[in-house]
Amino acid sequence: MLICNDKSNPKTLLEEIMALRPWRKGPFEISQIKIDSEWDSSIKWDLVKNATPLKDKVVADVGCNNGYYLFKMLEHGPKSLVGFDPGVLVKKQFEFLAPFFDKEKKIIYESLGVEDLHEKYPNAFDVIFCLGVLYHRKSPLEALKALYHALKMSGELVLDTLIIDSPLDIALCPKKTYAKMKNVYFIPSVSALKGWCERVGFENFEILSVLKTTPKEQRKTDFILGQSLEDFLDKTDPSKTLEGYDAPLRGYFKMLKPSKL
C-alpha cells in the first residue's frame, strides 16, 4: 500500500476520492483514508519490481492507469519516469494522487496509447513496463513492435498479459467477451507469445512468473462501481469464466531489445 500522512480535511478528501470512482489500481492511504481499490496491485508489483534495476534509468509505464506503479517506481531512483494512458478518468485520479505521492513532480503523464509510442518516443527508454495491455489490442504484434521501437538498444521490456495453458503455438480469440470484457482479442500461450516477441525482434525471452488471478488480488469493494472477478466466473465451476473459457491466468515476462540489429 502507498501511504501519505497528509493534513487534508478527511471529510472533503473522502468526497473527492468517491467522486473519482471506480478505483481499479491501488491500494492507497491518504490521511488515514484507505482507497481500497478493486485490484491489490502490490501483488503484481512484487512479481516485477526486481525484474531489472531502475536506478538512473529512463523508464516508461505503458497503460499506467492512475499511476500506482509509477509511484512505486519512484522508490527505485529512476532518472526519469513517463506514464502512458489515454483514459480520462485514470488521468484525473493520477492528478489527484500526484501531489501526495510525487511531490517533486518527477513523473510525466502522457494521454497516449501504445500505438503512439514509437512515433513520439523513438528509442527513448531503457526500461518499459507494459502490464495488462496486450490482450486489449486488436493487433498484439503491432503493439509489441511499438514497444520495441520505443526502447533504446539493449533496453528491456517487462510484460504482463493474460495467457492460456497450452504447449502449442496458439492463442484464444474470444467470440464476444472474455470474463465479461468486450475488449479482449488475443490470449496467447507462452510459446505463441515468445514467437510474437521474437518476430518483432526481442531476444532473451524470460518467464518471471505465471499466476492465476484470485479474489485476493481482484475483488469488489466500495471504491468501485459494478462487478468484479467473482461475478465474471462460473459460480458452479470457478475454474471457468461465464463464457466457458479457462479462468484468468497471467504471465509475467522480461525480454531484451538487442544492442545491434
Curated annotation (Swiss-Prot):
Q: What is its EC number?
A: 2.5.1.-
Alphabetical list of SUPFAM superfamilies matching this protein:
S-adenosyl-L-methionine-dependent methyltransferases
- Give the main EC class: transferase
The record ties this protein, via Pfam families, to:
Methyltransf_9
Respond yes or no to whether keyword tRNA processing is given for this record. Answer: yes
GO biological process annotations for this chain's record? tRNA wobble uridine modification
Keyword terms of this UniProt record: Transferase, tRNA processing
Q: Could you tell me what reaction this enzyme catalyses?
A: carboxy-S-adenosyl-L-methionine + 5-hydroxyuridine(34) in tRNA = 5-carboxymethoxyuridine(34) in tRNA + S-adenosyl-L-homocysteine + H(+)
Q: Name one GO molecular function term.
A: transferase activity, transferring alkyl or aryl (other than methyl) groups
Q: Which InterPro entries match?
A: CmoB, Mo5U34_MeTrfas-like, SAM-dependent_MTases_sf
Q: Which residues form a coiled coil?
A: none
Entry's family note = Belongs to the class I-like SAM-binding methyltransferase superfamily. CmoB family.
Q: What does this protein do?
A: Catalyzes carboxymethyl transfer from carboxy-S-adenosyl-L-methionine (Cx-SAM) to 5-hydroxyuridine (ho5U) to form 5-carboxymethoxyuridine (cmo5U) at position 34 in tRNAs.
Can you say what this protein is called? tRNA U34 carboxymethyltransferase
